[in-house]
């Protein structure tokens, strides 16, 4: 086993046993843990309060109790998250930060508040017009409300110094993860889709400084190896989440490497650093204003062009759109993105996904056919 494989196996173990690692961290540090749901929750506030931010993106749990509170056409990320909460899977959490980026998330917050009484609901309400000064001031006012809740839960005061330190820790992590994504495009034979996912997904369950250092060490091991020509196909992936190992293994079976992504669960979290400003709160407001993401207000619909440019830069042969079933923002984006891809002459395929998928044969057929056309 190579040294890099040892790192990948460590990340894999964390991904497959997240609760074990979360509980271990809590026991070792004495910190309380706060759940952070999609998308762009201000985890820096949690860290500045001396607590442990934990990513919560659903699972492949079978639905039962959540069906009482959600209609069938709510995405499986939210349905399975509520199911897990109702089943006590998140009882180690002291709070859950829930955003309002889509209609389904708005429902999620209210349902969580109603049904999960032992975990405090922390609403993260963000402005649609995030770039104007009024939007920035509104966001800061909401973050201040979040700070009050987090201080009450933790018993710690969030100071400018602690928030500044948290921002620096997160920005350093963002830089390293961006570097890792770029490295994956240069070593597609080593950083396979499943191994790439282990690194990306494990970040949600680890201390950020620890994850940053571990990814750095992994990259050093890989950089010591001479890059070899890759005989397979290179693709860019886009969507909300694509963390199913069964699905990613289908890419590997067809000799397809992921050389870049516009996945909300992956690189979209990291591509916007925090600019300098007068105060730490100003910095967070400016960062949010600078985010270019179609799940936020994006009247110019630049997502397709962004992916086209990435595909050209990383010499991708095609694009795979992993469409989360019942995700309205994604479904609205697709027609314009399809047009952008076709005008650029870049082949693409749409694969519908669901957290509860058991049979991937339809996806297998589509991916195999797509690979053969590249």
Swiss-Prot record:
GO terms for biological process: L-phenylalanine catabolic process; L-phenylalanine metabolic process. Part of the heterotrimeric phenyllactate dehydratase complex FldABC, composed of (R)-phenyllactate CoA-transferase (FldA) and a heterodimeric (R)-phenyllactyl-CoA dehydratase (FldB and FldC). It comes from the Bacteria. One of its GO terms (molecular function) is metal ion binding. InterPro entries: FldB/FldC_alpha/beta. The keyword 4Fe-4S applies. Its cofactor is [4Fe-4S] cluster. Belongs to the FldB/FldC dehydratase alpha/beta subunit family. Component of the phenyllactate dehydratase complex FldABC that is involved in the fermentation of L-phenylalanine via a Stickland reaction. This complex catalyzes the reversible syn-dehydration of (R)-phenyllactate to (E)-cinnamate in two steps, a CoA-transfer from cinnamoyl-CoA to phenyllactate, catalyzed by FldA, followed by the dehydration of phenyllactyl-CoA to cinnamoyl-CoA, catalyzed by FldB and FldC. Requires the activator FldI to initiate catalysis. Pathway: Amino-acid degradation; L-phenylalanine degradation. Pfam families: HGD-D. PANTHER family: 2-HYDROXYGLUTARYL-COA DEHYDRATASE, D-COMPONENT-RELATED (PTHR30548), SUBUNIT OF OXYGEN-SENSITIVE 2-HYDROXYISOCAPROYL-COA DEHYDRATASE (PTHR30548:SF5). Keywords: 4Fe-4S, Iron, Iron-sulfur, Lyase, Metal-binding. This is (R)-phenyllactyl-CoA dehydratase beta subunit. Appears to contain about 1 [4Fe-4S] cluster per heterodimer FldBC. Its EC number is 4.2.1.175. It catalyses: (R)-3-phenyllactoyl-CoA = (E)-cinnamoyl-CoA + H2O; (R)-3-(4-hydroxyphenyl)lactoyl-CoA = (E)-4-coumaroyl-CoA + H2O; (R)-3-(indol-3-yl)lactoyl-CoA = (E)-3-(indol-3-yl)acryloyl-CoA + H2O.
